[in-house]
């Protein structure tokens, strides 16, 4: 059978629970070998999309294809998919090695085959020294790396990762990112749901920005930032925001207010700084634009964590 270049294809997918629409007429495609991000706040529909891709729930309408198989009617596609859920579901009283051995049996792998791949998975997850340690004694970062290694037990073509670094400290998060880059270098395809802007910028090729189940933007991170922002950002805290807005309006491309912060987008930020000079009680931060600014620009509010 000829394989298409697309690992995932969604067309016009909608999902509701009761009267609440969770995913609304969503379409996107994920090419083989890329990391595609679903970026949005809690409640945007990211986890629901992941569950539909895995055949765990059915869409109300629309078409989903995973690895050239229609989902959920053809469960065969599931064999080529590894899953890293949002919350760890490891066996806490089993050792690291035992968790891998048991999980491999769910895929019908022989004991000999599983035992042959476990050493390389432990090395990949940097858990060789913890192989015989009970999972309940591991830290959060190690548990996430074990969950990632477990998802690779059957050498899947596609990884579906739902908020893989939520709750991790910065060091553990960066280590997961480094392992994901290694998988992409091997040609794996990754679907990544996240609300971390930095994570999306660092890992994703294209990404889809979601708000209340709707796609509000799609593209590569740098392209989205350039399209919707395209200039430096000045954050201003303190003072009378209405007064500040009027003061800097002539020198700004665009101004947003979120909470007690004024976001000013300007090609020449020095002009803004000159007019703020001498004003007391202000904290001013000048920085390059990021995906948080894109979300704020499109929705009028900051990303909720």
UniProtKB/Swiss-Prot annotation:
GO terms for molecular function: ATP binding; ATP hydrolysis activity; transmembrane transporter activity. It is found in: Cell inner membrane. Disulfide bonds: none annotated. Its main location: membrane. GO terms for cellular component: plasma membrane. InterPro entries: AAA+_ATPase (IPR003593), ABC_transporter-like_ATP-bd (IPR003439), ABC_transporter_ATP-binding (IPR050763), ABC_transptNodI (IPR005978), P-loop_NTPase (IPR027417). Keywords: ATP-binding, Cell inner membrane, Cell membrane, Membrane, Nodulation, Nucleotide-binding, Translocase, Transport. ATP binds at residues 40-47. This is Nod factor export ATP-binding protein I. It comes from Bradyrhizobium sp. (strain SNU001).
